[in-house]
Amino acid sequence: LLDREGGKPLNRVDYANTFYRELDDAEKAIEILETMRTDFLQMESMVRVQGFNRKTMKKGKWARWEKTYPEIISSLVFIYRETNRLEDAEIILTGWVNRNPTDGNAKKILDEVRSGG
């Protein structure tokens, strides 16, 4: 299910969360989510440089990924905090806040993470 080319990115986030919650496999969940985060950033860079077309990225696919990106970040931060990987959570949150400087909730969580929680 994870390797299907046509699979929806939001479904993969759900699979990652299932690995964490139901199978108690934080490492697999993090691997899935970090791969997705990297894939998103690469696609974003490609779209900025090359735009949309059949060979690079279709608008519908990009819209699905854009919609899913906050869920990827949220899930990563949650799992990192739950597994006491606060430095990793801080890195992810710092990147998010830099991209979304008006997100007060993310800033609050970042402050909590920086203070050890």
Name each region found by the language model:
Residues 22-23, 83, 117:
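Structural motif corresponding to the intra-repeat A-B loop/turn of tetratricopeptide repeats
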Residues 19-20, 80, 114:
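Residue at a conserved register position within TPR or TPR-like alpha-solenoid repeats
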